[in-house]
Amino acid sequence: MSNALISGLDPASFSSVIKPVDDLFRYVNGPWIDTYRLPDDRSRYGSFDKLAEDAENQIRDILEDDDCPAVKSRALYHAFCDTDTINQAGITPIRADLDAIDQAADKTSLTRVLGSLNPTGGSDQFAMAGYGDPGDPEHNIVHIEQAGIGLPDEAYYCEDHYAPVREQYVAMVAKQLRQAGYGDELQTEEQAHRFLEVETRIASHHWDNVATRDSQKTYNPTDFAALSETLAHFDLAAWIGAWQAAYDATAAGTAQSLDLKAIMQHIIVHEPSFLAGLDAFWAASELDDLKLWARVHTITGWAGMLSREFDETNFAFYGKVLSGAKQQRDRWKRGVSLVNGVCGEDVGREYVKRHFPESSKQRMEQLVGNLIDAYRVSISTSDWLGEATKTKALEKLSKFTAKVGYTNHWRDYAALDVRDDAGLVDNMRAASLYENGYQLSKAGQPVDRDEWLMNPQTVNAYYEPSLNVIVFPAAILQPPFFNPEADDAANYGGIGAVIGHEIGHGFDDQGSQYDGDGKLNNWWTDEDRARFEQRTKALIEQYNGFIPRQLAEKYADDPQKAPHVNGALTIGENIGDLGGVNIALKAYAFALDAASGKPEDGSPEAIRAALDAAPDIDGFTGLQRFFLGYASIWRTKQRDELAEQYLQIDPHSPAEFRTNGIVRNVDLFYAAFDVKPTDAMWLDHDQRVRIW
């Protein structure tokens, strides 16, 4: 059968009751959502998760193969799955850490303890990593960001809506303290309540999720002297000295030498007011409160690697309360996730050999090229961009780099000291040492433009503004996103929209502040930026009005409590989605023209003519199949708890609005399904947002 006769869709699964003109998302996905029962170990399942599950099974097969070439990945996997040894050890693997915290005689001593524990996986109240400098994208620099809290974000500590979550959090902390031997029920409950008060003071200095994604506000270059002054009561010099001594005393320190103080001479602070607040917190806090914070974070940070009682208590809160899961995932599945996170490229290289055909890479590279061509036409013909900004935008687009499938520069794990004869915690300490050394040793060095931030077995994609690069790992290049045997319509609606989305991040509210070389640099005229922000404001307002159906039903008796989408938090992803669909449509039209020997023509009339000429398959036109393919990739079902958490912290909108909220702004959607003003999906023409 010819490829052109295969739609790549499953029309039999579509709704016979819901119409696409009223709810495209549920027309395509409604019957599945209504009948699919989430397994007890899942908080969410959908198109992305199905592919991740497939990759998970494939990685397991590799790790359990006696001839597995990824020996360090295999050793870590087996250490995690050896529950007999883990359960026998109890809390012993971290007892020395806790003793060191308990014995700290003053704040400086505690600072040194925290510094000594950080390289091997200990928690701290700020996070540190080495990666590209937005002001000098050719070089890496140390970045410092806020940290120090155990709930998803600062809102969980102050909003009445989260009071029940805080109660459960306190109960979890108290139980973990009892399990670690820090008193009876009454004593540990008092400690847990005090801990929440301490952590709430830290959270009060945190920036919210909208502010932390602001590229300009979070770019604050400084130096070691200024940082030391800001953290005068924390004693940064003592912390660094202890960190260095602990790191140097390990095999990783020998294999990946670094001078922490030297590389911190130039740094970027993401949230300056947080560090000032953290210093005030240290100045005002009692030593016992600081030790309590360190003690709890040491226990909860390692709980998932400790014996059953710690692991189950940790899951009861983070898995059940926050995410709604009913039971833990199988141990082997968690082991695969751990390996993917620690040394994913080690096993990923074998994954690519076994499961990624070179033909898929070639087809994807062609699709990416078509999408970039479509963006070029869209920018060139924009009716709201001035010529100066168009020129800069086209220059940036010409410098885009696409990476497909897998890296050609695999990470070297020689310094990763994971061993078959070591316990899980010891191996995880070795993994933390390796990762700290690997990341921080980049500071001051040229950026490795061949490095990937995702493993090939990851079902995702990303745009990195400081490199002006879009990356598509191998695992996402499968149905429903990409089917090499299918007609183009569903592929452009699936992976084409994803490609367009990632390219679109280069021109969203944050990515548009970086130039073609990845430098944080304003290349817009004031007039064009104002017009851009006018359009994004309209999209923000649209999304602010969206409430996920499942939460509207949950709060039906008190609708005012129903949480809604945060348009400002999700605007970057929404711009990416909207641009992705519009540009993928244009690229699909260009592909149809190319197949029929016609020259590329970006006029609306030519695009419509090309789309109308596409063959009907499975009773749908090419234009309809494009939108049906797009809706298919967002098939998702999740528990209420996770839906609420994501509304607070996730910059992505819920799946139903990544579908319906986007296509109602796309004129060709109305043409595809003959949408009328009386239909639920209708949005008046003057209210539709058009950006790219």
Features from the language model and the residues they span:
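Hydrophobic/aromatic-rich, well-ordered segments within soluble, folded domains that form packed cores
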Residues: S13-D34, Y156-R178, I571, L578-I583
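Pocket-edge structural micro-motifs
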Residues: V28-N29, Y36, I144-Q146, A474
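Noncatalytic, helix-rich "gating/capping" subdomain that lines the substrate-entry/channel surface
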Residues: E64-Q366, N370
